[in-house]
Every structure is written in C-alpha cells, then in structure tokens.
Amino acid sequence: MILLIILLPLVGFLLCALFSRYMGRVGSAVLTTMIMFVNVILTLILFYKVSVLRRLYFINIGTWIYSDSFQVNWSFYIDNLTITMLLVVNIVSALVHLYSTDYMSHDPHLPRFMSYLSLFTFFMLMLVTGDNFVILFLGWEGVGLCSYLLISFWYTRLQANKAAIKALVVNRVADFALTIWMVSIFFVFKSLDFHVVFPLAPFLLIPRLFFLVLIYLY
C-alpha cells in the first residue's frame, strides 16, 4: 500500500502525459483528480494503522549506490510524522487537482498542467517518505523542477518566466546548502540513513556538533 500511495501520482503523470490526446482535456483532468482522491483514501487507511494501531513501516526496495562505506538504498519509512505529512500533501494536492479541473477547464493545455501537478505530488511524497537524505534530496530537486514548470506554465507571459527563473535560482541556493549539510552529516555519522542518524544524534560529541553548526551557519 505504501508504494502504491507514492507511485499513484507518477502513474497519473505518465498516463496524462502519454495518452492525453486520446483522453482529451476533461478525461485527463478527471483521471488525475480521481487518482489523487483514491490516494487520499489509501492514506487515511494507512493513517489509521500508524496513528491508532501504532504500527511503523520500513520498506527497502534495493541498493542504489554502493561503494566501500557509502551505501544508498531505495528505502522508505513511515512513522507518525511521515503519515501526517502524507495526509497533508495528498489532501491538499487532491483539492488543487479538483480546483484546477474547473478553473482551467477552458485552457487547451489543461492535460499538461494536470500532469505537472501529479508529478509535483509524486516528488513531494518521495521527499517526505524517503529514509535517507539522498532520496530526500531527489524529492527536493523534483519539487523544484515541477515548481518551475508550473510557474512558467503560461510561458508566453514575461512575468511568469521571470518568476519561474527566480524560483529556480532560490532552489539552487538551497540545493547548495543541503548538499554541504549532507556531506557534513556523512562525515560525522558515516551514514545518510535517517534510522541511523537520528538515534545517534543525542550522543554526538560536542566538537562534531560545533562543526555541524559552523557548516549550517556558513
């Protein structure tokens, strides 16, 4: 169910991007919106299991990068914080899909807009469910890309293009800071996995903590 929740928006994006000419504007909008509301229902079920039944979920799909002491897995972790963010992201995204279906009903490029929304949602879900900083970084990069695509959707408007470029530049600054922070965390903990870093953080030696603070301030 967890992988289904994460991947459904990506499926909506692919269907809308590849078959919109056959489904038409209305069909593409209805399909992506229905997928998001199905995702909300699945997330509510998962929310009950995590928050009420007190279950935690860890999924490791496989190893992506492996080199000596550096290893990155395609892994996802669901706890109370994660499921709360999942619920917020999916509900807000479903409502935005629904609103856009009516608000942009007369736009000939509606399928493209809906596909961007679905892709944005997929990367956001990846960001909040990933169990390591690399997956979080990939999700962040995807969110930045989709933000650019959505802001510059009406690419013939000069102001839209300027705003999109500004958003892209701001995201690149954050990328630089996040990259330095990831390198610093690996230097201290020898791992980028959340389930390794978080339990060790309270036992961090003061000099290393000071080093991380300096990196952050820089």
Where are the model-predicted features located?
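...captures the hydrophobic TM-helix bundle architecture rather than a specific catalytic motif
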Residues: 1-218
